[in-house]
Regions:
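The beta1-alpha1 cofactor-binding region of Rossmann-like NAD(H)/NADP(H)-dependent oxidoreductases
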Residues: 34, 56-68, 100
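Conserved glycine-rich cofactor-binding loop
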Residues: 9-10
Length: 258
């Protein structure tokens, strides 16, 4: 059994690698930094011994790089059993003041890279009628996000895409499972990269990773959450006016700005 994880050099992606290793999976770990991936690989092998861990460098914001990654994996390993689209980042600030190039990179990473990987590997999984795809979304995908407008919008895309694909698979009775996992604040490097501090207490990355992997295998929900509190927020977002949720998000993000 093979699990491919993007953004595996740190945070949730790294901790999910340990979760899959604990379940007996061989791993293909992907990130932009081979040096950091080597450290993760060594940690996993030290803990689990015989676990096969391959590391591959890929910038998932670049379509050609993503296509090359897929082709290389197909040639070397054939079909995989699990794809975890974890790579992603955010930024905080007024939309008209944040850096355009960073916005484009965020969209390409959070949406385009995930989209291409999902399509390519899903096509293979559908042919053999088995496999799992886990897209790491966010509670941010359920509401407008003033001061993090681009990030919130990218995560909304992930949730909607996943729901749509899941329906397509269901109507043909496919055994392939696709799901979107939506954490709230997590104690990772995300807040540093996004230039924010979380106003709510974040969950540990290891706890979130365990919940995410357990949900993929033990739940039949297409969209699921990292805690009851985060699920309640998502439910509120469905019933409250978007103007109200936008106001709440704005006040939350404003407190987070350093």
């Amino acid at each position: 059994m093979i699990s491919l994880i993007t953004g595996a050099s740190s945070g949730i992606g790294k901790d999910m690698a340990f979760e899959f290793a604990d379940r007996g999976y061989d791993l293909i770990l992907v990130a932009r930094s081979l040096d950091r991936l080597k450290e993760v690989k060594n940690e996993i092998i030290k803990k689990y011994g015989k676990c096969n861990v391959e590391i591959m460098k890929c910038d998932v914001s670049n379509v050609e790089s993503v296509k090359n990654l897929y082709n290389d994996i197909q040639k070397e390993f054939g079909n995989i059993d699990v794809l975890v689209n974890n790579a992603g980042f955010g930024d905080c600030g007024k939309f008209y003041e944040t850096d355009l190039e960073k916005d484009i990179s965020m969209i390409n990473t959070n949406i385009l890279g995930l989209h291409v990987l999902t399509k390519l590997f899903l096509q293979d999984m559908v042919k053999v009628n088995k496999g799992y795809i886990l897209n790491i979304a966010s509670i941010a995908g359920f509401m407008p996000g003033p001061l993090m407008a681009t990030y919130y919008s990218t995560k909304a895309y992930v949730v909607r895409l996943t729901r749509a694909i899941a329906k397509e698979l269901k109507v043909v009775n496919s055994k392939v499972r696709i799901a979107a996992f939506c954490p709230g604040p997590v104690n990772t490097d995300f807040d540093k990269n996004a230039n924010v501090t979380f106003s709510l207490k974040g969950q540990s990355s290891s706890d979130v990773a365990k919940i995410g992997v357990n949900g993929l295998f033990k739940s039949n929900k297409v969209v699921y959450f990292s805690s009851i509190l985060i699920r309640i927020v998502a439910c509120l977002a469905k019933i409250m006016p978007e103007s109200f949720m936008a106001n709440q998000a704005y006040m939350t993000q404003k407190r987070k700005l350093r």
